[in-house]
């Protein structure tokens, strides 16, 4: 897998702060976002309309 820009956010947060993180995988993007706030659990590749949730 190559490097991608991931949009990461907190599920259900009405005032969403979206982070953009460069990472190779969903897990790496979530791990980096959780250095800012442990609640980050949703991510999608920039320009892609599918997303994944980390439970």
Residue ranges and their predicted role:
Residues 1-17:
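Short aromatic-glycine-(Arg/Gly/Cys) micro-motifs in beta-strand/loop hairpins
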Residues 7, 23-24, 52-55:
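Serine/threonine-rich, low-complexity intrinsically disordered segments
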Residues 14-27:
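A short, exposed loop/beta-hairpin motif centered on an aromatic-Gly-Thr core
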Residues 25-29, 39-42:
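Short, low-complexity, polar/charged sequence segments that are solvent-exposed and flexible
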Residues 35-55:
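Short, mixed-charge low-complexity intrinsically disordered segments
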